[in-house]
Design a protein with these regions (language model features):
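Sequence/structural signature of beta-propeller domains
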Residues: 1-164
Length: 164
């Protein structure tokens, strides 16, 4: 990850592996979970696998990872936000957010299966910071909660149903 700013925005766990999501350059870092825990105690860096995902642009700014959770063993539901800035740390004008699904069955070639913009409901653009699954009612219907941040200290929890 040379020449990449480090800004871990999300983590997810599945099948003995920890996945960290870097907002800058939309990189996913994969560790064996037990090796990662050992690293925290010993400082011995474990084997790292890295993949980069291309996410859509809104108004010429690429979306950046903001949240992630596993739906199934190889499917990650992710959120990404778009701000008018090229800086991985400092906030810019909020342009919008999206939700999507990534298939990581081949971690070296992960694929964004689908994504949708998250509607603003006539308000200012929403910046979604994370997502978690409340329940899976069926294979096609998943209830989630988003947490938003307007960069002014205000947050909201928003429940939504995703048709997968």
């Amino acid at each position: 990850m040379a020449n990449t700013e480090l800004n871990i925005e999300a983590s997810a766990f599945s099948d003995g592996f920890l996945y960290l999501f870097n907002r800058s350059n939309n990189v996913i870092v994969k560790f064996d979970y037990q090796d990662f825990l050992s690293y925290l105690k010993t400082g011995n860096l474990p084997k790292i696998e890295i993949s980069r995902i291309s996410l859509p642009e809104i108004e010429k700014f690429e979306a950046g990872f903001s949240g992630a959770t596993f739906k199934e063993k190889s499917q990650i539901i992710f959120t990404a936000s778009v701000e008018a800035t090229d800086d991985a740390y400092n906030d810019g004008e909020i342009i919008g957010s999206l939700i999507g699904v990534i298939n990581i069955s081949d971690f070296q070639k992960p694929k964004v299966i689908r994504y949708n913009l998250i509607p603003n409901n006539g308000e200012n653009p929403i910046k979604v910071e994370s997502v978690t699954i409340l329940s899976s009612k069926s294979n096609d219907n998943t209830e989630v909660v988003f947490i938003t941040d307007d960069d002014n200290g205000n947050t909201k929890l928003i429940k939504a149903n995703l048709k997968m």
